[in-house]
A protein has these predicted regions:
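Structural recognition of the conserved hydrophobic beta-strand(s) that form the central parallel beta-sheet
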Residues: 109-110, 149-156
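P-loop (Walker A) phosphate-binding loop of NTP-binding proteins
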Residues: 1-2, 29
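Conserved lysine of the Walker
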Residues: 6
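C-terminal regions of RecA-like/P-loop NTPase motor modules
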Residues: 3, 88-105, 122-124, 139-147, ...
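Flexible beta-alpha connector loops of hexameric P-loop NTPases
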Residues: 49-56, 78-84, 118-134, 161-170
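Residues immediately C-terminal
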Residues: 115-118, 187
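Cytosolic-facing regulatory segments adjacent to core modules
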Residues: 16-104, 172, 217-218
Length: 266
């Protein structure tokens, strides 16, 4: 739903990918590119959003130098006006970046799908929302296949999904054609209780790559001031089960996996 943290989630994932030495292209149609860059800066520099502008130059320089030793990944943020850019524009952008900057992204973030345009249909021209949003989803998936790169985007929920504590694929706003096209979908679920703990629930809705019943629901921590996601203690996952929000079969699988890889750090 609106305000749950779609952009924060995507900027946090983008920051994590950058730290792995990968190239990231972030296309925004909702927020100014400076605001997106600001969120990624806060995450990477480990500084609160409100403190970024007043960060002393020496401290900034130290953090930047330290960051440069950690990663060789490059970030490009590109802003388009809302509902005016489609896959044709994105293809031209990829070609231009490859030609002029020798930049090939390892992942593309698009913020967000519902406010893209379709390259095949004109909005409002005797085309209903189901067909229009499905067309955008198909075009973005085609872009991912053609360029062999993952495309990560977001959508909204319906009014019913906005107040629901257990979102399903049927709660996707505007078009069920979107989940029919996507390869992997998950929902971000928030509540007053989770917000008080600085946490958010993630629920797998669709997964063509693995069994979606494995770790169907799990909890992650949220630091909104630094636009950062982090792992929470195992107790939070157990509390999720005790509250009836998860399957016992999923939990046993999750606990078993956690035990096998308990010494690993991400």
């Amino acid at each position: 739903g609106t305000g749950v943290g779609k952009t924060m989630f995507m900027t946090s994932i983008a920051s994590s990918v950058l730290l792995q030495g990968k190239n990231v292209l972030y296309i925004t149609m909702e927020m100014a590119e400076e605001r997106i860059a600001e969120r990624i800066d806060a995450n990477l520099l480990n500084v609160g959003m409100s403190d970024l502008e007043e960060l002393p130059y020496k401290m900034y320089e130290t953090k930047i130098n330290k960051l440069q030793t950690k990663t060789t990944g490059q970030l490009i943020v590109k802003e388009y006006p809302t509902a005016s850019a489609h896959v044709g524009h994105f293809k031209n952008l990829l070609s231009e970046l490859a030609l002029k900057k020798s930049f090939k992204p390892d992942i593309v973030f698009i913020d967000y799908l519902n406010i893209c345009a379709s390259s095949r249909f004109k909005a409002g021209a005797n085309v209903n929302s189901y067909t229009y949003i499905k067309a955008i989803a198909e075009e973005l998936r085609g872009l991912a296949v053609e360029h062999d790169i993952p495309v990560f985007s977001a959508t909204q929920t319906t009014r019913g999904g906005f107040v629901s504590s257990d979102i399903g694929l049927e709660d996707t706003s505007e078009s069920f054609g979107l989940p029919a096209t996507a390869d992997f979908m998950f929902a971000l679920i928030s509540s007053e209780e989770l917000e008080a703990k600085n946490q958010i629930m993630v629920k797998q809705l669709k997964n063509r790559y693995n069994d979606p019943t494995i770790n169907r629901k799990f909890i992650i921590g949220v630091d909104r001031s630094k636009m950062r996601l982090y792992d929470v203690e195992q107790k939070a996952q157990e509390d999720l089960v005790e509250s009836g929000q998860s399957d016992t079969s999923m939990t046993s699988k999750f606990t078993k996996k956690l035990g096998e890889f308990s010494d690993f750090k991400i």
